[in-house]
Amino acid sequence: MRLRTWALAMLLGAPSCSGLIASAQYSAPATPAPYNPIALAEVTGAPRTAVQAGQNNYQTLSQNPYLGGVPSGKLSAAPVELSLEDAVTFGLKQNLGGVLATDAVIDARGEKWQALSSLLPNVVTDTGFGVHQVNVKASFGLSIPNEPPIIGPFGYFDSRAYLTQSVFDWTSIERVRSSQAQLKSAEFSSKDARELVVLVIVSNYLLAIADQSEAESAASQRDTAKALFQQASDQKAAGVASAVDVLRSQVQLQSREQKLISAENNLAKQKLVLARAIGLPLGQQFEMTTQILYQELTPSSLDDAIQSACQARADFQSQTNRVRSAELAKKAAFAERYPSLGAEADYGLSGVTPGSSHGTVDAAATLRIPIFQGGKVHGDVLRADASLTEERQRLEDLRAKIEQEVRDAYLDLEADAQEVTVEKSAVILATQTLEQSRDRFSSGVTDNIEVVQAQDALAIANDAYIASLYNYNVAKISLARATGVAESRYAAYLRGN
């Protein structure tokens, strides 16, 4: 059985198209796509087994923004209750990946205003006052009869407002439209980041629940091993069991105690991962209050899901706007060949002193006609065309990727549902086997080798059942992500609606 470890290694891998915005000057944070670091993991215990193997990529994990958060709030001495809905709410506000995506939208909005400034009026003012003295002969080589060679000192005052306005510049117009498409792309990327945040938070919450179930199962197995050890000791004292039976049961007890310690440690560490991803104060203790029971999900038809996925997926809409932005950028490059018309004007007061100043005005219009620019326009067009081709190819690749993710999610959902049924039956059979083995040992029919083997089989069956439940619930939320409804319908999918 494959074991997917979405919780800790959810977002490793190459950046997807959804987190990027096409611009030579601007690039939003990459939105990594979820991937499974352990493609084929044998069931040897629980979800934690594969996760520990995935922690070999710890450095990559620690650099992933979706696994970090911006801590907020005050530390409480008492443990706080944390439901799944609370965790998602905190994550949407404080997860680092979501916060960076929001900042990218602000950055794109600033770039749009920068492009728009070339079309809007520019007004500046300038005020100056000075005192001058001129040597006429030294400056101009003139001698004026009956006049001193030095004129002045005299004052000069000028206060003026300057206006520049682009009347027609098709290149700037297309660049503004391109930046508007970039802004829309950034906004859709931010929405896609929220989808990924929900995917990460829910998956980590599910893994924490699985670890908690593992710890409870390990505690139950420890109690059973303790009872078996006491039973073997009593039977040895009664002369029914041998010393090796006591030693065997004692070794089994210590093994179960060790597993309980490991399970509790894994649970504590997974809680730290979850707390960091949702931005809880460092060191804040919490208790998970949402219990995710087995609820079978019956999704819509595969064809309907594939058709609706592209329309619902924010990363697809983001990439569509990137293509639009690249198209407009190419038009802007072509428009560099077109003439442009601008206007300039100024009005102000000039005089010897502010009190004796008079109003003056200047106005001019400028027509610029490009004739030869050394091949710059041709180069800009080639680069813009290459960028457009790249974005179109990325869009088609993303379309195929979305369909693959939907198909994968449907396959996982069906397979994991079957595995839950099989593993639940295995737990029932293993429990019956342990009960019969204990009865046989109590009756003196056999030694406790059968009991130890049956207890090990039950432990493996319990762990596999916990893993199958975790995988099935992750398959649900993965389907919600693949169809673009993770934020709006994650709770309904987990409930089987």
Region spans (language model):
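Bacterial N-terminal signal peptides
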Residues: 9-19
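Amphipathic alpha-helical coiled-coil segments
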Residues: 100-115, 193, 197-218, 227-229, ...
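Acidic, low-complexity, intrinsically disordered peripheral segments
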Residues: 2-7, 20-51, 133, 282, ...
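Small/polar-residue-enriched beta-strand and adjacent coil segments characteristic
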Residues: 80-83, 122-193, 302-304, 308, ...
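Periplasmic alpha-helical coiled-coil/stalk elements that build and connect Gram-negative outer-membrane
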Residues: 194-308, 412, 416, 457-458
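Regulatory alphaC helix of protein kinase catalytic domains
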Residues: 60-90
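Amphipathic alpha-helical coiled-coil scaffold segments and their short linker/junction regions
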Residues: 88-92, 146-147, 241, 245-252, ...
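Transmembrane beta-barrel architecture of outer-membrane proteins
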Residues: 83, 107, 156-158, 203, ...
